[in-house]
Amino acid sequence: MLRTMMKSKIHRATVTQADLHYVGSVTVDEDLLDAADLLPGELVHIVDIDNGARLETYTIAGERGSGVIGINGAAARLVHPGDLVILIAYGQMEDVEAKGFEPHVVFVDADNRVVSTGSDPADAPAGSGLLRGDRPAGR
């Protein structure tokens, strides 16, 4: 049986542009694609932290070092410049691989520069003001 597992996550990126009249996709700084082990054309889910919108699209490589997170096409009606988003990609794997698989988790700053990377999907980097995803609030 194949299991669908989270393989890559860029957490709390800031949308830098949105263009309704584009053919679709999300443009992502190539440095972020590399850090998250994402390829151009790869399916990603986008979760908008500000308004709760969820959508799926594919990645396009943006200029390396630019910090670009560009929402293109119809998704620009849901996600806007300045919104915080999470980009998530999933992979399918057999049980044995899934049990030992370590995803690529990337946290960025307000300019979409990498501040930490790891493999723990519940991690909340020190000083981020976030809570770990596997602990009750207040602990």
UniProtKB/Swiss-Prot annotation:
UniProt-annotated stretches for the region Disordered: 117-139
Q: Keyword annotations for this protein?
A: Autocatalytic cleavage, Cytoplasm, Decarboxylase, Lyase, Pantothenate biosynthesis, Pyruvate, Schiff base, Zymogen
Tell me the InterPro entries matching this sequence.
Answer: Asp_de-COase-like_dom_sf (IPR009010), Asp_decarbox (IPR003190)
Q: In which pathway does it act?
A: Cofactor biosynthesis; (R)-pantothenate biosynthesis; beta-alanine from L-aspartate: step 1/1
Which cofactor does the UniProt annotation name?
pyruvate
Provide the GO MF annotations for this entry. aspartate 1-decarboxylase activity
Q: Which residues form the active site?
A: 25 (schiff-base intermediate with substrate), 58 (proton donor)
What happens to this protein after translation, modification-wise? Is synthesized initially as an inactive proenzyme, which is activated by self-cleavage at a specific serine bond to produce a beta-subunit with a hydroxyl group at its C-terminus and an alpha-subunit with a pyruvoyl group at its N-terminus.
One GO biological process term is: alanine biosynthetic process
- Main location group: cytoplasm
Give the HAMAP family listed for this entry. Answer: PanD
Q: What is this protein called?
A: Aspartate 1-decarboxylase
The source organism is Nocardioides sp. (strain ATCC BAA-499 / JS614)
